[in-house]
Regions:
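Hydrophobic/aromatic-enriched cytosolic interaction surfaces used to assemble or bind macromolecules
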Residues: 1-247
């Protein structure tokens, strides 16, 4: 869990505060404790953007119907009665993200801020990677690594064509899933590109293996990925937060 405030793009005025969670209690209970201890949370801010790491269903914007979102989510992903189903519209990506958040967690946030916006943690990453999707003539597949997971994304015709999450425990698992999607999307035919972003595990080993199957792959270096902003060089700040502030 972490908290941040500021505008690093304007003046490098940015405060970043990680919070060590107690895994024996819920996220909501941890947040209640954080409000008692965190100087940042006690600073009197009225508005908050909450990024939730949660399974997310993506619906094309032109097919989205608000009245159907909850039913579709419950038939697609696991849902508990203790959760509220929320949505976040992404006009640039022509999609609506549908996801669930603990009612207790949302209540804690609502009790401390006058205005809140909730979105999936991946939303900032999707928006940032989308900027690369249509640069040049080659088709592109993206793999983003975080928290022992790999998110594989492909954009086509200004929208998502593929988006899925995989457990990334080993180089062989990563390679298997990547090459499966690479072939599924028909990218093994032609001079296409693979982009790797985030905390790439076993980077050298993975790149060595990829050379056998993918002619063009790129590992996005964080500093240059975010135009060498001062915030981008801080390793303790996760990629998704950099994408949110700098993307």
């Amino acid at each position: 869990m972490l908290f941040a405030v500021g505008d690093p793009q304007a003046d490098d005025n940015f405060v970043f505060e990680p919070y060590n969670v107690n895994n024996s209690i819920s996220v909501a209970a941890n947040l209640r404790e954080a409000f008692k201890k965190s100087e940042l949370l006690q600073s009197g801010y009225k508005h908050a953007l909450v990024a939730i790491d949660a399974p997310t269903m993506l619906v094309p914007l032109d097919e989205y119907r608000e009245q159907d979102a909850e039913t579709l989510y419950k038939h697609t992903l696991k849902w508990q009665r203790s959760e509220d189903i929320l949505t976040s519209t992404m006009p640039k990506l022509n999609a609506v993200a549908v996801f669930a958040v603990s009612k207790d967690l949302k209540m804690v946030v609502d009790n401390h801020f006058e205005n809140i916006q909730v979105q999936p943690q991946m939303q900032a990453v999707w928006t940032h990677l989308y900027k690369y999707a249509f640069a040049g003539i080659r088709q592109k597949l993206f793999a983003y690594f975080h928290d022992k997971r790999m998110e594989v994304i492909r954009f086509q015709r200004n929208r998502f064509e593929f988006c899925n999450s995989y457990v990334a425990n080993s180089t062989q698992d990563i390679l298997y899933y990547l090459l499966y999607v690479w072939k599924l999307m028909g990218m093994d035919r032609g001079d296409n590109e693979l982009y790797l972003a985030g905390n790439v595990p076993n980077r050298d080993e993975l790149c060595t293996e990829l050379q056998q199957f993918v002619n063009r792959y790129h590992v996005l270096e964080v500093a240059t990925d975010f135009n060498n902003a001062a915030m981008a060089t801080q390793k303790e700040i996760p990629y998704d937060l950099k994408a949110l502030y700098l993307g």
